[in-house]
Amino acid sequence: MLRLAKRIVLLSTGLVVLELLGASLQVRAQDVLPEAPARPRMSAPVDRNTDGETKGATYVSLDPSLNRLFSGEDPKSLTDLKALQTQQSKVAAKIHQVTVNLQHGSTQGSGVLINEEGYILTAAHVAGKPKQKMWVVLHDGRRVEGVSMGVNRDTDAGLVRILKTRDENNQPWPHAALPAVGERVKTGQWCIAGGHPGGWVSDRPAVIRIGRILAVTDSTVVSDCSLIGGDSGGPLFDLQGKLIGIHSRIGIDVDDNMHVPMNVYMESWDRLANSEAWGVLPGFRPIIGVTADRQSDTKSECIIGTVAPRGPAAKAGIVPGDRIVRFHNAD
């Protein structure tokens, strides 16, 4: 898909990248904590009901009249618009308490609490590397110590944990509602994003933005929620307040954003919880910037279907319809 082939920019502040942000990489030595907390006793991050669903602090029941809008259809009346706005406002009000700011060194990003023990989903480029000390800033400004755990750089999925499994009042940490196992996001679906754009601001809660799902693959969800630096690792919710993705990176425009879907975290959970690191971050591999025309039926040549604007192929003069008949002196 051409949209997914665009040049990309990691969203966390203090990390760098590409001339689009005009930023420079800053690296600061980190204090490494002792061993990360023991792995949870489950193969999924939370205790779930028989459907695999968990109703956390962000869950908002959906009126049957909203089922059509929930599935991605457009509002058709003023009544639809008001009902949609009301539902979005209810979810937005709950997102603040589970959206956190993550800090280590000069880098800041966002994250979301996903169980009572203080586990936090974020982006791999925010978590950095396993077993690093991190500060977790909660919705009310409290700062608590955390540690980075596993990072799947192939998909930009990261895991962090608050060191204490309960807060200072011995209460469990609030956490987001998670979808049922196998529940997938659909193109056109309405979504609600949270995060800390530009980093933590003491008198400002997590910033909420509304959008829709533009595209879905097994490893990426694309939305038009407007995101900028500092939002990386923040949560993306559906209209029921269920967590459906984690902010990863943007394309050329701030309303062309890629998120890591929940199935990636579920599939990688054991390795993430075991503080493993693997893969290469998206956007850091060499790319050509083309996709093949899948409708062409030939084994002797490859027909170019799309060319990413301003990518290496475009700069070399390759256009859709070109035929590749030889590569590296091989037919």
Which residues does each PLM region occupy?
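A conserved glycine-rich beta-strand in the N-terminal activation segment of trypsin-fold
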Residues: 85-89, 99-117, 142-145, 233, ...
